[in-house]
Amino acid sequence: MKKVFFGLVILTALAISFVAGQQSVSTASASDEVTVASAIRGA
């Protein structure tokens, strides 16, 4: 169950970073790293 939850967290983080990338391409990679790091800390 933890793997499934962690997978969902990663997918959500990627979706958020993708939307952020659509709004601002120049900061897409930076916001992606921050989002993933926050997701890992939360899990």
Curated annotation (Swiss-Prot):
Coiled coil: none annotated. GO terms for cellular component: extracellular region. The keyword Secreted applies. It comes from the Viruses. GO terms for biological process: latency-replication decision. Residues 1-30 form the signal peptide. The record marks A37, S38 as: Cleavage. Keywords: Latency-replication decision, Secreted, Signal. This is Protein AimP. The lineage of its organism: Viruses, Duplodnaviria, Heunggongvirae, Uroviricota, Caudoviricetes.
